[in-house]
Curated annotation (Swiss-Prot):
One of its GO terms (biological process) is rRNA base methylation. It comes from Prochlorococcus marinus (strain NATL1A). It is found in: Cytoplasm. It catalyses: adenosine(2503) in 23S rRNA + 2 reduced [2Fe-2S]-[ferredoxin] + 2 S-adenosyl-L-methionine = 2-methyladenosine(2503) in 23S rRNA + 5'-deoxyadenosine + L-methionine + 2 oxidized [2Fe-2S]-[ferredoxin] + S-adenosyl-L-homocysteine; adenosine(37) in tRNA + 2 reduced [2Fe-2S]-[ferredoxin] + 2 S-adenosyl-L-methionine = 2-methyladenosine(37) in tRNA + 5'-deoxyadenosine + L-methionine + 2 oxidized [2Fe-2S]-[ferredoxin] + S-adenosyl-L-homocysteine. S-adenosyl-L-methionine binds at residues 167-168, 197, 226-228, 302. It holds the Pfam family RlmN_N. CDD domains: Radical_SAM. Binds 1 [4Fe-4S] cluster. The cluster is coordinated with 3 cysteines and an exchangeable S-adenosyl-L-methionine. Residues 106-340 form the Radical SAM core domain. This is Probable dual-specificity RNA methyltransferase RlmN. Its cofactor is [4Fe-4S] cluster. Its EC number is 2.1.1.192.
Length: 359
């Protein structure tokens, strides 16, 4: 007997492929075309409940509901739109948790910044998400839903997805890879338009390369490493978890990843005014990047209430970038979006949780 497709831990159909849903229908005693109908209604029509899929026999729909099967869509709690049209969504899960995602539009693209966990265990000093610790990892349906929800809310097809929201993607590696497969196969976002970010977890980059090759056939998404400092002492100050992963070991593992995948690595560097944005830091960073198949993304810090870090001036950002460019480093500056609506990672969710506690 063919094995029944594996549902997520919350018995959701969202995240399953057309082939999986066809097999699911057959195992349920229905014709395989019923699975294709479910696929169309979930991924193209945005069905949020089984009862809304009117083409399915009501008797079967009722049976699935009794078994606890669900589509697995999240419930919108709040939405905020910034002056630059950046969208921030807060969505509720089946167990009462809050997921945060961001839609970032430009003229030619719509990037969705998705979360991979509820909270985060890494404790990066500049990040609002890490202040509350980790609650749990997200299931595939909860990751994919973020992209669908932004598509529906903005009435526009997402072109890019970045795993740069709440959580450490490599601590939820299987669900992240499964959701990438769903995003490419079922929603139509090419792997090259997807970025997976990590602060660096020891002994995971080679595993990521091998697992991704097994799951996706070929690694085409971009790996973005959150570096944020050019030396170990400063990195541990900004990212406490870095104490267990020396920067030289991290870079060595990045080179192995490049060898295994043939893909360059992107390094994220958040500029904290007066702390890691001096000329000497740019020079140290340029030395680290020497001989690397890489790209550096500079990000000016978005302040959060709990920390006293400062946002650098635009002139300091420009000087830092120019110093890297003059030393042959491929570098760009990421534009800050949604600053008037607390669009830094985790801010809106944390404020919402605080309000709930107060009330």
């Amino acid at each position: 007997m063919t094995k029944l497709p594996k549902l997520s831990s919350n018995s959701s159909l969202l995240g399953l492929s057309s082939e999986d849903l066809e097999e699911f229908a057959r195992q349920e005693g229905e014709k395989s075309f019923r699975g294709r109908q479910i696929h169309e209604w979930i991924y193209q029509r945005g069905a949020k409940s089984l009862d809304s899929i009117s083409v399915l026999p009501k008797k079967w729909r009722d049976s699935l509901v009794r078994k606890g099967i669900q589509i697995g869509r999240l419930d919108e709690i709040n939405r905020v739109v910034a002056e630059d049209e950046t969208l921030k969504l807060l969505m509720g899960t089946f167990d009462g948790e809050i997921v945060e995602t961001v839609g970032i539009p430009t003229d030619k693209r719509l990037t969705v910044c998705v979360s991979s966990q509820i909270g985060c265990p890494m404790g990066c000093k500049f990040c609002a998400t890490g202040k509350g610790g980790l609650n749990r990892s997200l299931d595939v349906n909860e990751i994919v839903d973020q992209v669908i929800s932004v598509r529906e809310t903005m009435n526009r097809r997402p072109t890019h997805v970045v795993f740069m929201g709440m959580g450490e993607p490599l601590l939820n590696i299987q669900n992240v890879l499964d959701s990438i497969e769903c995003l490419t196969s079922d929603i139509g976002i090419g792997q090259r338009k997807i970025t997976v970010s990590t602060v660096g977890i020891p002994n995971t980059l080679s595993d990521l390369a091998k697992l991704a090759q097994d799951r996706l056939g070929r690694v085409q998404f971009t790996l973005a490493v959150s570096l944020h400092a050019p030396n170990q002492t400063l990195r541990e100050l900004i990212i406490p978890s870095a104490s267990s992963y020396p920067i030289n070991s991290l870079l060595k593992d990045c080179k192995k990843y490049i060898d295994l995948t043939g893909r360059r690595v992107s390094f994220e560097y958040i500029l904290l005014g007066g702390l890691n944005d001096k000329d000497i830091h740019a020079e140290q960073l340029a030395n680290l990047m020497r001989g690397f198949q890489s790209h550096v993304n500079l990000i000016a810090y978005n302040p959060i209430a709990e920390e006293n870090f400062k946002r650098p001036s635009q002139s300091r950002v420009n000087a830092f970038r120019e110093l890297l460019e003059n030393r042959g480093v491929a570098v760009s500056v990421r534009a800050s979006r949604g600053r008037d609506k607390d669009a830094a990672c985790g801010q809106l969710r944390r404020q919402t949780i605080d309000k709930i506690k107060i009330n």
